[in-house]
């Protein structure tokens, strides 16, 4: 690593300053980013069901919303905290396109006491193949009169 840029401030680049400032911000916000809900989510997609499990322990049940529009599942959480000394707001949003073989009419959710949100839907039964017999058309011959 060269110390040339640090001791010659007149020749420092604007982009170098920007990169230094961005790296500083990244280090300062790293603890906040580590607690995001995205790190504690799990998606299960097997032959029997589709399920998503989220850790939403930082949110109250009334702070959560789950919507289903067609096959698009939206999960949102928003919490506001106002005190005499300040204001804090936490939020998250997940949008998931459910697989085509999921029974969207049977989507159900459950929130455990320890803040684990589970959303599950069974898979549709596969349409069984069947053999289709071939019917032969009978053509009547017209006799010449």
UniProtKB/Swiss-Prot annotation:
The molecule here is called Heat shock protein hsp-16.2
- Give an example GO biological process: protein refolding
InterPro entries in UniProt: A-crystallin/Hsp20_dom (IPR002068), Alpha-crystallin/HSP_16 (IPR055269), Alpha-crystallin/sHSP_animal (IPR001436), HSP20-like_chaperone (IPR008978)
Q: Where is the sHSP domain?
A: 32-137
Does Cell wall biogenesis/degradation count among this protein's keywords? no
Question: In the record, what lineage is assigned to the organism producing the protein?
Answer: Eukaryota, Metazoa, Ecdysozoa, Nematoda, Chromadorea
Record organism: Caenorhabditis elegans
The UniProt similarity line reads: Belongs to the small heat shock protein (HSP20) family.
Upregulation details from the record are: Induced by white light exposure.
Q: Does the keyword Flavoprotein apply?
A: no
Q: A GO molecular-function term, please?
A: unfolded protein binding
SUPFAM superfamilies named among the record's database cross-references: HSP20-like chaperones
Query: What UniProt keywords are attached to this protein's entry?
Result: Stress response
Q: Name one GO cellular component term.
A: nucleus
């Amino acid at each position: 690593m060269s110390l040339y840029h640090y001791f010659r401030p007149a020749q420092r680049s604007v982009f170098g300053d920007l990169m230094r400032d961005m790296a500083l911000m990244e280090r300062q916000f790293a603890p906040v980013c580590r607690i995001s809900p995205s790190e504690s989510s799990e998606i299960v997609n097997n032959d029997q069901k589709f399920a998503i499990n989220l850790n939403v322990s930082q949110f109250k049940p009334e702070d959560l919303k789950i919507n289903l529009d067609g096959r698009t599942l939206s999960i949102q959480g928003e919490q506001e905290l106002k005190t005499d000394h300040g204001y804090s707001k936490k939020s998250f949003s997940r949008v998931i396109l459910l697989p085509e073989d999921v029974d969207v009419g049977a989507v159900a959710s459950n929130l455990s006491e320890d803040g684990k949100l589970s959303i599950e839907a069974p898979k549709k039964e596969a349409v069984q193949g069947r053999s289709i017999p071939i019917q032969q058309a009978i053509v009547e011959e017209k006799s010449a009169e």
